[in-house]
Every structure is written in structure tokens, then in C-alpha cells.
Amino acid sequence: LSNKPNAREAIVDTASRLFFTQGYHATGLSQIIKDSDSPKGSLYYYFPHGKEELALTCINKTSEIVVRQLKQYVEKDVAVEKAVQNFILQMVRDAEESDYTGMVPFSFWVAVETSCISEELRKACQAVFMDWQDVILQRLLEEGTDAELAADKASVVVSLFEGALLQTLTCRSTGPLLAAAKMIPGLLG
């Protein structure tokens, strides 16, 4: 077992990066072990159920990061449409600063690829989208939007920023994210 205090974190970070860049099926445990600089025993110690358990951990970590970032914008004292617009504009800056690398829409590998592997992973992916929508939904409800309309708007917004990010990375252009940001006031206002 590794004496490194962050062996588990290194494994999760490496697996997340590889799953995002190569996909679930193309990423092997041996590569994760090698690239994370961790002994094989560490991976099986932290993830005794193997690759699927590791993928589930990566899914949950990704969700937590996005929820935290989204909440930072949505919980500010500005209207929800401005908050979501600012969140998307931050994605624009991130895309430009990273030269369109290291950013992958959640739906790209996780929801599409892993949700077909097992019911547990599918449910985890579903929960991620629901968690993201809930951040927006709660703010819309606080602002007095009808519950059903708020749920629909939150779903559309998550679909919009995921789709815009996918197009941004594919086209290597911030145009789709900028267009999405422009549409937010009409959707949420």
C-alpha cells in the first residue's frame, strides 16, 4: 500500500482525466495505476470493486465540483439569469485559458458512455444532472417562479450549457457558449 497521503486522490484525479480524454472503455486500470504513480494495491484497496466503483467516484467528484462552482454564482445577490450567464461566461474564459483542453462536458463521456454500463452508473449520472438542475431550480423558486416552470427552465439551462460546451470544444470556438450566455436572460428572465 502506498505511503503517499494522497494516493486515493491521485488515483481519482488520474482516472477522471483519462476517462474524460479517452473514455471509459479505452481506459484500463493498469494505465490509471501507472499514470497516477500508485501501487496496484492502492487502487484495489481504495476501490475493491474495481473500475466501475472508481468511475462512480469520478462521477460524484465531477458533480460536486460543478455544483460548488454553480452555487458560487447562483447564491450571489444577483438575479438568477445574471448568475447563470456569469457561470457560462466563466466557462468561456476557462475554455480560452486552457486552449480548449481539459474541459469535457459531463454528458460527453459520463452520461452517454457509462450510463449504458450499469444501472448504478446510470442512476449516478441522472443524479448529477438533477443536482445541477436543483441549484438553478431552488433559486428560481426563491425568485417566485412556479415550481413546474422552474423545473423545466432548470432542465433546459443545464442542457443548454452542456450542449454549448460540447460545441465549443468540438469547434474550438467560444461562439456556442457566448450564444448560450446571450440566451439565458430570455430563458430565465
What are these regions (language model features)?
Residues 10, 14, 18-57:
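Helix-turn-helix
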Residues 58, 82-86, 97-120:
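Amphipathic alpha-helical segments used for helix-helix packing
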Residues 59-65:
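Short, basic, alpha-helical segments at the C-terminal edge of helix-turn-helix-like DNA-binding modules
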Residues 71-101, 153-157:
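Hydrophobic alpha-helical connector segments
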Residues 94-98, 116-120, 158-176, 187-189:
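Amphipathic C-terminal alpha-helical segment
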Residues 106-109, 148-167, 179, 183-186:
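Hydrophobic alpha-helical segments that form the core
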